[in-house]
């Protein structure tokens, strides 16, 4: 079942990415609204069940784990930096930088809220032992009646996030391959990319993913850092070329 679900999600991501970046971006905006609304529901259900004493880090051992956790989180979030591969397909807008900063601030606020819910209901010790502490936390939420269980809602929202992430990855890989081959990537090569992503994702789908929480986040940071440095260097080269032409 996990393999079939992975294949289905990846096929949906390929179908969305095949429509081009504009259509993919519009679909992701709809996904964002759905995920945001779902998270607000989870927050409203969970905020009243927090044990605030569990949210404070009292011991030196707990405080010592904060830097490693922050670095791992940064590596996971760095996957969004792969969108830099798509800069050539977009145009800058007035106030775009401010809008990006506001969205990043909202994203980190939501992430902090999720961490607060997990710690306030599970505690740091139990959260470190379970595989998916957020889903474990959600399993204890709900009221009698229509909202008795929220796992189904969270699972559906999780799939939307996976589709968006895989679609972004396929678009970025397609752009990188087109740059390497110096020509557009057709549907045949896009199928090869999708198949390669599926094969690489099989260990995680089968539950054998020892590198997912360690090397993958750090790999994201390394790739995005190298990409940013390359773009900065290219920008300096263009400035130098302009100054030489003026001179």
Give residue ranges: language-model regions.
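Small-residue-rich transmembrane alpha-helices that serve as helix-helix interface/gating elements
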Residues: 194-196, 212-230
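Hydrophobic alpha-helical segments and their helix-loop junctions in multi-pass secondary transporters
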Residues: 17, 34-59, 74, 119, ...
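Membrane-interface interhelical connector segments
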Residues: 121-151
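Extracellular/periplasmic helix-loop-helix junctions in multi-pass membrane proteins
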Residues: 181-187, 201-220
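Selective recognition of specific alpha-helical transmembrane segments in multi-pass small-molecule
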Residues: 12-14, 33-47, 102-127, 189-204
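Alpha-helical transmembrane segments of helical membrane proteins, especially in multi-pass transport
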Residues: 107-122, 148-197
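Membrane-water interface regions at transmembrane-helix termini and the short interhelical loops
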Residues: 9-31, 89-94, 207-211, 234
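Hydrophobic, membrane-embedded alpha-helices of multi-pass small-molecule transporters
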Residues: 5-6, 18, 43-49, 58-110, ...
């Amino acid at each position: 079942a996990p393999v079939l679900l992975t294949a289905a999600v990846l096929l949906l991501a390929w179908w969305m990415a095949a429509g081009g970046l504009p259509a993919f971006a519009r679909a992701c905006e709809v996904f964002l609204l759905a995920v945001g609304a779902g998270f607000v529901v989870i927050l409203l259900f969970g905020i009243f069940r927090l044990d605030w004493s569990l949210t404070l880090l009292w011991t030196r051992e707990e405080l010592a784990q904060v830097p490693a956790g922050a670095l791992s989180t940064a590596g996971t979030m760095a996957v969004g930096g792969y969108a830099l591969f798509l800069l050539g397909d977009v145009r800058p807008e007035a106030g775009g930088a401010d809008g990006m900063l506001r969205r990043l601030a909202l994203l980190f606020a939501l992430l902090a809220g999720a961490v607060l819910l997990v710690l306030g209901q599970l505690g740091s010790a139990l959260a470190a032992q379970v595989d998916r502490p957020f889903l474990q936390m959600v399993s204890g939420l709900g009221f009698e009646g229509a909202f008795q269980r929220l796992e189904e809602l969270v699972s559906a929202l999780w799939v939307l996030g996976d589709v968006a992430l895989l679609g972004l990855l396929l678009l970025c890989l397609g752009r990188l391959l087109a740059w390497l081959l110096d020509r557009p990537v057709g549907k045949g090569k896009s199928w090869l990319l999708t198949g390669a992503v599926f094969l690489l994702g099989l260990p995680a789908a089968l539950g054998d993913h020892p590198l997912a929480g360690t090397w993958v986040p750090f790999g994201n940071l390394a790739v995005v850092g190298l990409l940013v440095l390359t773009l900065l260097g290219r920008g300096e080269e263009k400035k130098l070329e302009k100054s030489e032409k003026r001179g």
